[in-house]
């Protein structure tokens, strides 16, 4: 092979390589398009209200859980256009059994489609939704709804205390999980809400907490008292002092492993400094 022929061959290879990214980009249509999820809405058969925290499960154990708006984004491409059995379960809610005793429904999901599943309420209380934790509207947001909802930065938290104080509802939670590390907050976290926003009576639940936060925006500890172990608060109440000004007071406990209370007392929360 002459020098000229080798030079021309090398030039052809370089030209082909330079076009490779654009050739790969062309492969994105139409057979490699992203499959849109199918929207499943879980509703109370009697009221039509959305029902959060209902689990649907496929025959190969894919599980999806409805969010505060009762929505599920079923995003399994292999199920689109396929008759699919979904086991349906949720505390206090159910669907009728079939002849073999299975509680579920058969649906045909379609990309971008919508399916409604009605559940029967077996308990007295109607579930309104989760108040805390992450992803309250995660499924809805995957489907393009509730895009104005902002995450709190809290993954989950322990039992709640609350009290009315200076015209607002004050909330305090125990051990609180944060997204950045397995060890979160262990000296109570807290927030306030306007009284009118505190007790929603219609779903979906959207409580607008104003959390007490660190400068880096993570929820802060409310009651990091001296001594080993977590600090837990209970019995929150707003009381007038000698000067007539109301103070937020509580009982506190200090806890050592495994779960030993070694100190108990009363405290006044100075919310100005939190």
What are these regions (language model features)?
Residues 26-32, 101-124:
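Extracellular beta-sheet/turn segments enriched in Thr/Pro/Gly and aliphatic residues
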Residues 118-177, 184-187, 192, 197-225, ...:
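N-terminal regions that are enriched for targeting/export leaders
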Residues 79-107:
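A short, solvent-exposed loop/turn motif at the edges and junctions
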Residues 23-38, 45:
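Beta-strand-rich domain onsets/edges
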Residues 160-182, 232-257, 263:
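Hydrophobic core segments of beta-strands in well-ordered, beta-rich domains
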Residues 35-38, 46-60:
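Short, ordered, surface-exposed loop/turn motifs in non-cytosolic proteins
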Residues 60-76:
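Short, acidic Ser/Thr/Gly-rich low-complexity loop/linker segments typical of extracellular
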Residues 272-274:
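Conserved small/polar residues in nucleotide/adenosyl-binding loops
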